[in-house]
């Protein structure tokens, strides 16, 4: 049986140990029944009972999901298509090329790196091509949604680069260009990172590229959350505006399988990434994910602009409906958002994660985020919301007032969450068909 881990917080560790004890005492048949039941439990939560407002997740096209169980993924794929180390990969290598070509077309890129297991690892690849351990990279603060993979406790720090938190403009929820320029001239970073886990307004990519060129740095745009909007041309195009490379998560607004991607228009950057990917950080990789990405890109070629535009429209309508219900939506005096995401200020509710746990009891799924506001002890000071999965299931602007009312009823104490949950589930079950699928 799994041993206890004293370094893990007490509550989660007790929960895991109780489950491990149960599973350790069961037969293989019993554990199989449990496994199938857990899979169904997850399906019911996300497809029938709950509204998922987390912009870090989405519903995948069933055809793309089928690619993950197509028998391709168990075939090792070492080396370049056309000259694989293993034999019998004629079908697999064609899948790899097709997926890369479709990714390049959708993102307007000349080069696409698929051999990336996650968005965090995509950022690691980026730091590895730009810097060596001990060098400095500029990254966004968690206060404006900077991801932990940018920071000392994540991929950047594990690799050994020094992550310098860039000065930020709280009103624009992005970096402060003038102060950034001063710091860059003084500290000479090897890479400047833009793109957050919460993106409300456009980032100053062109201005940052000018600064990077002055000091000989690369510009990384982390599009983990924005890649769907970028693919659908409802956001600025980072590669066109000056980013040397763009890292992606494929399962958020892009609605594909779990994993990462990197795209670039710079041949030298592509060459360095190729070397990091192989023989550096990957030998064999999951070709089934490449097939799933290819299937996902076909949806974006046909419906990408429509889907992305609808995510933004619905996000704005949702945020405005929450304001009307009396909730303190962040940046409400500045237009709230131009993306598929926004946030609620958490000070009046005990913190963002406290709010998320309260809403979970009403079958509404969300999560906390950092905001440029006073900190909350033991919690984050914002609650992040987004529309990728809502729109994927057919919700539109006209449906947001009712959803906003459910949320306000819970957060403002009009009703206890368990009283709201049945009505939430009844409303959720009206949206039972995935949209923007070929």
From Swiss-Prot:
<dbReference type="GO" id="GO:0005737">
    <property type="term" value="C:cytoplasm"/>
</dbReference>
<feature type="modified residue" description="N6-(pyridoxal phosphate)lysine">
    <location>
        <position position="252"/>
    </location>
</feature>
<keyword id="KW-0456">Lyase</keyword>
<dbReference type="GO" id="GO:0016829">
    <property type="term" value="F:lyase activity"/>
</dbReference>
<dbReference type="GO" id="GO:0035999">
    <property type="term" value="P:tetrahydrofolate interconversion"/>
</dbReference>
<dbReference type="InterPro" id="IPR015421">
    <property type="entry name" value="PyrdxlP-dep_Trfase_major"/>
</dbReference>
<dbReference type="GO" id="GO:0030170">
    <property type="term" value="F:pyridoxal phosphate binding"/>
</dbReference>
<comment type="similarity">
    <text>Belongs to the SHMT family. Alpha-methylserine aldolase subfamily.</text>
</comment>
<dbReference type="InterPro" id="IPR001085">
    <property type="entry name" value="Ser_HO-MeTrfase"/>
</dbReference>
<comment type="function">
    <text>Catalyzes the reversible interconversion of alpha-methyl-L-serine to L-alanine and formaldehyde. Cannot use alpha-methyl-D-serine, L-serine or D-serine. Cannot use D-alanine instead of L-alanine as the substrate for alpha-methyl-L-serine synthesis. Does not require tetrahydrofolate (THF) for activity.</text>
</comment>
<dbReference type="GO" id="GO:0019264">
    <property type="term" value="P:glycine biosynthetic process from serine"/>
</dbReference>
<dbReference type="InterPro" id="IPR015424">
    <property type="entry name" value="PyrdxlP-dep_Trfase"/>
</dbReference>
<dbReference type="Pfam" id="PF00464">
    <property type="entry name" value="SHMT"/>
</dbReference>
<dbReference type="InterPro" id="IPR049943">
    <property type="entry name" value="Ser_HO-MeTrfase-like"/>
</dbReference>
<dbReference type="InterPro" id="IPR015422">
    <property type="entry name" value="PyrdxlP-dep_Trfase_small"/>
</dbReference>
<keyword id="KW-0663">Pyridoxal phosphate</keyword>
<dbReference type="GO" id="GO:0004372">
    <property type="term" value="F:glycine hydroxymethyltransferase activity"/>
</dbReference>
<dbReference type="InterPro" id="IPR039429">
    <property type="entry name" value="SHMT-like_dom"/>
</dbReference>
<protein>
    <recommendedName>
        <fullName>Alpha-methylserine aldolase</fullName>
        <ecNumber>4.1.2.-</ecNumber>
    </recommendedName>
</protein>
<comment type="subunit">
    <text>Homodimer.</text>
</comment>
């Amino acid at each position: 049986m799994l041993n206890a881990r004293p370094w893990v917080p007490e509550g989660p560790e007790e929960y895991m140990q109780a489950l491990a004890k149960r599973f350790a005492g069961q037969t293989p048949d019993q554990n199989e029944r449990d496994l199938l039941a857990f899979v169904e439990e997850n399906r019911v939560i996300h497809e029938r009972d709950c509204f998922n407002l987390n912009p870090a997740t989405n519903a995948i096209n069933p055809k793309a999901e089928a690619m993950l169980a197509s028998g391709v993924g168990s075939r090792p794929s070492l080396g370049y298509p056309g000259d694989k180390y293993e034999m019998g990969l004629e079908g697999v290598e064609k899948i790899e090329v097709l997926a890369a070509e479709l990714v390049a077309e959708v993102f307007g890129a000349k080069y696409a790196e698929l051999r990336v297991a996650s968005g965090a690892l995509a950022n690691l690849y980026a730091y590895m091509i730009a810097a060596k351990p001990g060098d400095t990279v500029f990254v966004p603060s968690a206060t404006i949604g900077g991801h932990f993979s940018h920071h000392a406790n994540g991929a950047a720090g594990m690799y050994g680069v020094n992550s310098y938190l860039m000065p930020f403009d709280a009103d624009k929820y992005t970096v402060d260009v003038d102060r950034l320029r001063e710091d860059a001239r003084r500290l000479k970073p090897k890479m400047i990172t833009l793109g957050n886990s919460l993106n409300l307004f456009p980032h100053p990519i062109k201005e940052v590229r000018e600064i990077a060129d002055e000091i000989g740095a690369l510009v990384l745009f982390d599009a983990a959350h924005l890649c769907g909007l970028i693919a659908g041309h409802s956001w600025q195009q980072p590669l066109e505006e000056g980013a040397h490379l763009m890292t992606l998560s494929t399962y958020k607004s892009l609605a594909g399988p779990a994993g990462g991607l990197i795209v670039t228009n710079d041949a030298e950057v592509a060459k360095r990434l190729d070397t990091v990917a192989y023989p550096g950080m990957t030998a064999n990789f999951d070709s089934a994910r490449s097939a799933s990405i290819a299937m996902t890109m076909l949806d974006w070629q046909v419906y990408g602009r429509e889907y992305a535009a609808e995510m933004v429209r619905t996000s704005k309508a949702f945020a405005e409906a929450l304001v009307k219900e009396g909730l303190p939506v962040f940046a409400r005096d500045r237009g709230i958002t131009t993306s598929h995401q926004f946030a609620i200020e958490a000070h009046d509710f005990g913190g963002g994660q406290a709010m998320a746990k309260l809403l979970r009891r009403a079958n509404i799924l969300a999560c906390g985020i950092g905001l440029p506001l006073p900190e909350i002890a033991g919690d984050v000071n914002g609650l992040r919301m987004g529309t990728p999965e809502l729109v994927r299931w057919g919700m539109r602007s006209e449906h947001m007032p009712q959803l906003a009312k459910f949320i306000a009823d819970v957060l403002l104490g009009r009703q206890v969450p368990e009283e709201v949950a049945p009505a939430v589930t009844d409303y959720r079950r009206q949206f039972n068909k995935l949209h923007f699928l070929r």
